[in-house]
From Swiss-Prot:
Protein name (Swiss-Prot/TrEMBL): N-methyl-L-tryptophan oxidase
GO cellular component: cytosol
UniProt entry keywords in alphabetical sequence: FAD, Flavoprotein, Oxidoreductase
Positions carrying S-8alpha-FAD cysteine: C308
Classification via InterPro entries: FAD-dep_OxRdtase, FAD/NAD-bd_sf, Me_Trp_Oxase_MTOX, MTOX
E.C. no: 1.5.3.-
Its job: Catalyzes the oxidative demethylation of N-methyl-L-tryptophan.
Amino acid sequence: MKYDLIIIGSGSVGAAAGYYATRAGLNVLMTDAHMPPHQHGSHHGDTRLIRHAYGEGEKYVPLVLRAQTLWDELSRHNEDDPIFVRSGVINLGPADSAFLANVAHSAEQWQLNVEKLDAQGIMARWPEIRVPDNYIGLFETDSGFLRSELAIKTWIQLAKEAGCAQLFNCPVTAIRHDDDGVTIETADGEYQAKKAIVCAGTWVKDLLPELPVQPVRKVFAWYQADGRYSVKNKFPAFTGELPNGDQYYGFPAENDALKIGKHNGGQVIHSADERVPFAEVVSDGSEAFPFLRNVLPGIGCCLYGAACTYDNSPDEDFIIDTLPDHDNTLFITGLSGHGFKFASVLGEIAADFAQDKKSDFDLTPFRLSRFQ
């Protein structure tokens, strides 16, 4: 059988692409080296932030607004356990923070619902938070967080119900191109398609070694917290910048545990074996202490944590492009630790590519050629 589309990597973007392409009527094969959702990539750990007024640059705002529409649609398939939780997101940092300036600019340009608070206003609304006098907060009331593993599980199930073929626990070892399309090699044999999408995450260079992607080991952890920090108490998800420039992110507490991670830093790695489990690097359990001590002093000890990986591009912007000389193969990579919120729209973009549809978005800033 020759498929319309083969998807290599069915984590966040791949799961979405499989669903949207199958829903569009294409004959699709989803593949993954493991059984998604799984612990080997960048989507585990239950939750991911979604922010609309984007501190990483306003070029992302049209994408994230479409992503939100698609997340809302997907959430309707899980109304008892919603995939998107509109908790709001408070962005904290010094008044002269470049990241917060970008958030404010994005909000102004796209007329987003963002409220600016000074230090006293932040602490009056959320007494659990402590910030210096020179800090401000930009509160995105319509943002929140996503259930990442539940989202992937839902997409995969919906795609399967729609007739999508799925080949999991079976790594793709090679990709070949010829006049008839794309062939992938696996332990289960060879499969052919008219087009392919490569969204293999951290280890995309195993298949496409020419891509400028650097895997980085990252950790996040859950700390002891009480009901004051919960969604029920209107405690928001958050990003926070310390005076030294370190960037943190976190979520409202659930089951007396608050999840937090440090966005910058981490350990550069070159193989999956180097992504050692949480606590095998001495700093893992204490990485969030500077933020917790200064901003959330009521949070208790570290309960447990997990390691994941970022697939970093040189400028930490996404890479979305077709292979040079092979315009029937699209790759989506270099998501650099801020990609999950876009998984829905990136999957839709991939499905449009498979249907020969022109994208509704300007993807020029994400082309591979910017590094050449």
